[in-house]
């Protein structure tokens, strides 16, 4: 009898164990389904570009080549050889007499003090931020995230603190001031906002992108460090971003991709753009002879990462086939994909004519594809990280940006970095809207200046 009860007890225990294990399997399956469902079907963080503003210097800050050289001569800082080199670079730079420098640089000798740099920063950023706020009736206290990038001017209090103080922003605003990131830092700032918005929903962000010219003039004799004196000009951009659903109807663009490439592990790339001290103890930014080659290498790596995300399968297949054929010795060159099948517009950092022409050649683009970049270099000079936004405004002012179009921004910067941002136009762009090109867009492109080839001999 006891043996019978013992058998029943064991049977009940086994049944109980079976049910518990079965429930465990069901629960585990539910958890896995929930996890996969969350990652595959969760709402994506969509980044909207509501609008942006670019600084347009007043005409009295123009720096014609003749005046530029005259001021350098009168200053008594440079010997004749250095003056001749800078004049040669200026005349071949592709920069027009309309490009501007701050009032403090017009002084003789130029004022390179911290107060001069602050004055320049205030002049540029206060104007473009106020323009954005006024145009869209934005309360400064509604800004949740504030990011600035200025490579060589890193004051304390920071640049974002200047803006917070000027416009009376909230005490809990998330602010970041990036420095030392070079001319590609504008895209880096957008990427930082993108990452922050993954965590902070329903946020409004303001990105400020510029370089201060006033404190960074070089006063020595080193050829590689004199180039920066001639190509950098006054400029800046303010970009208003949002991940709020209610802003989708008024946004101009939607962010599609950001690809960042850093080749700083290679010494030649790392040293291609570097702030340093010359033999006489004078500080400047040296640009190496290998700069175009370094930029090309970084761009190739960046393109390899971007290509599969944007190119049609037909172009990807052509690339793969040519790659295999080259491995087997059947072809010498690998097929360059036609990126015009992925993008309607291209904005290449206006760092110099050699850089623009290098990208044009590498990607096999047409003259019209790089028109915005050349025109920006011609009209505004190298405005560092903000140049990409002047180019985008150029396309808008020309009436070329249509709903559904995609634009590829390509930035290069010290480190060495190559960064890409892809935007999709999601609204009708009014070409008559006021921007940094409105008063003279009918004059562009400038024949003979923006399309002629530049021999890369400035450093030879």
From Swiss-Prot:
Keywords: Acyltransferase, Membrane, Transferase, Transmembrane, Transmembrane helix. It holds the Pfam family FAE1_CUT1_RppA. The active site is at residues 183, 262, 345, 349, 382. InterPro entries: 3-ktacl-CoA_syn (IPR012392), ACP_syn_III_C (IPR013747), FAE1_typ3_polyketide_synth (IPR013601), Thiolase-like (IPR016039). GO terms for cellular component: membrane. Induction: Repressed by herbicides such as flufenacet and benfuresate. It comes from the Eukaryota. Belongs to the thiolase-like superfamily. Chalcone/stilbene synthases family. This is 3-ketoacyl-CoA synthase 7. It comes from Arabidopsis thaliana (Mouse-ear cress).
């Amino acid at each position: 009898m006891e043996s019978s009860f013992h058998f029943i007890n064991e049977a009940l225990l086994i049944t109980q164990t079976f049910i518990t294990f079965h429930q465990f399997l069901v629960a585990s399956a539910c958890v896995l389904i929930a996890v996969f469902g969350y990652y595959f079907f969760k709402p994506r963080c969509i980044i909207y570009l509501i609008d942006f503003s670019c600084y347009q210097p007043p005409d009295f800050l123009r720096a014609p080549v003749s005046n530029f050289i005259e001021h350098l001569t009168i200053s008594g800082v440079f010997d004749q050889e250095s003056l001749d080199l800078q004049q040669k670079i200026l005349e071949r730079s592709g920069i027009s007499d309309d490009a501007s420098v701050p009032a403090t640089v017009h002084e003789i000798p130029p004022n390179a003090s911290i107060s001069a740099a602050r004055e320049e920063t205030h002049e540029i950023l206060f104007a473009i931020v106020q323009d954005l706020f006024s145009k869209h009736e934005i309360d400064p206290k509604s800004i949740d995230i504030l990011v600035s990038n200025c490579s060589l001017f890193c004051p304390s209090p920071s640049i974002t603190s200047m803006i917070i103080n000027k416009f009376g922003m909230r005490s809990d605003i998330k602010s970041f001031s990036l420095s030392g990131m070079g001319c590609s830092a504008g895209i880096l700032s957008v990427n930082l906002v993108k990452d922050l918005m993954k965590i902070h929903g329903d946020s409004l962000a303001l990105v400020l992108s510029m370089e201060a010219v006033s404190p960074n003039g070089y006063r020595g004799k080193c050829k590689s460090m004199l180039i920066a004196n001639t190509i950098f000009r006054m400029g800046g951009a303010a970009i208003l971003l949002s991940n709020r659903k209610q802003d989708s109807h008024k946004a101009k663009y939607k962010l599609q991709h950001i690809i960042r490439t850093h080749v700083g592990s290679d010494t030649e790339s790392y040293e291609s753009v570097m702030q340093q001290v010359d033999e006489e103890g004078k500080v400047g930014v040296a640009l190496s002879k290998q700069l175009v080659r370094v930029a090309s290498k970084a761009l190739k790596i960046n393109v390899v990462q971007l290509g599969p995300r944007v190119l049609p399968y037909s172009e990807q297949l052509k690339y793969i086939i040519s790659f295999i054929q080259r491995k087997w010795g059947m072809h010498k060159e690998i097929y360059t994909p036609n990126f015009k099948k992925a993008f309607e517009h291209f904005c290449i950092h206006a760092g110099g004519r050699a850089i623009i022409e290098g990208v044009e050649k590498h990607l096999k683009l047409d003259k019209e594809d790089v028109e915005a970049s050349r025109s920006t270099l011609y009209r505004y000079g190298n405005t560092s990280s903000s140049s990409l936004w002047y180019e985008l405004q150029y396309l808008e002012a020309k009436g070329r940006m249509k709903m559904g179009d995609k634009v590829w921004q390509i930035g290069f910067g010290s480190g060495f970095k190559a960064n890409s941002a892809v935007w999709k136009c999601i609204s009708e762009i009014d070409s008559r809207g006021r921007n940094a090109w409105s008063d003279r867009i009918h004059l562009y492109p400038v024949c003979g200046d923006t399309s002629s080839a530049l021999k890369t001999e400035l450093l030879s």
